[in-house]
């Protein structure tokens, strides 16, 4: 076996189950492709095996303790090298996943992963969220995003994709509370409500806060605005 990773206990401890052999094989293959293609596609600063499995793979899954994932239609906005979207697909093959990123290099890499891992019901699209959201209005049960933008920015980029009562899940770092305070009630304007906050203790790879929103009503026509406008108003990227 090319990879030496064997600390599967950390997955069991944090998720409550041991990944199957098929899941382990697919994660190992994903890690191999990530490391092999990293220089060419400029994917991640983290390449050490233990770190990738914990800081990228496991971190992409911790939110699933708070919400049941089965066959939902999910969009991962600003997926980069596939976090959390590819990892979710490996663990929950019944999902229907769309990965989007504005950087076409990432999309080329994701298509290699999808092909080599023989993943089904998953598509990688080169698109900007604020543009695609107008085309794919209210199409998704879940929109998810990790480390893409400041809270008020990502809320506006993501909300139109969701069906009414759809969930927006934001995988955030320790400053999520500060971002909520600074978001100037944009959630009310966007007709979306914070329903749950998952604070994860620092188990050696940084404190994480995952935010769960629910869409209450259709998105007002104004949103999302052009990216430059959103960022200008936010004052944050
Ligand atoms: C810091 S990376 C995070 C990647 C991945 N989600 C992760 O957790 O490692 C942010 C990604 O979001 C993408 N991105 C930024 N703004 C975007 C937008 N408006 N629409 C689509 N993708 C965007 C970037 O190209 C980049 O790949």
From Swiss-Prot:
GO terms for molecular function: rRNA (guanine-N7-)-methyltransferase activity. The keyword Ion transport does not apply. GO terms for cellular component: cytosol. The keyword Transferase applies. It is found in: Cytoplasm. S-adenosyl-L-methionine binds at residues 78, 83, 129-130, 146. InterPro entries: rRNA_ssu_MeTfrase_G (IPR003682), SAM-dependent_MTases_sf (IPR029063). Belongs to the methyltransferase superfamily. RNA methyltransferase RsmG family. Its main location: cytoplasm. Keywords: Cytoplasm, Methyltransferase, rRNA processing, S-adenosyl-L-methionine, Transferase. This is Ribosomal RNA small subunit methyltransferase G. Its EC number is 2.1.1.-. Specifically methylates the N7 position of a guanine in 16S rRNA.
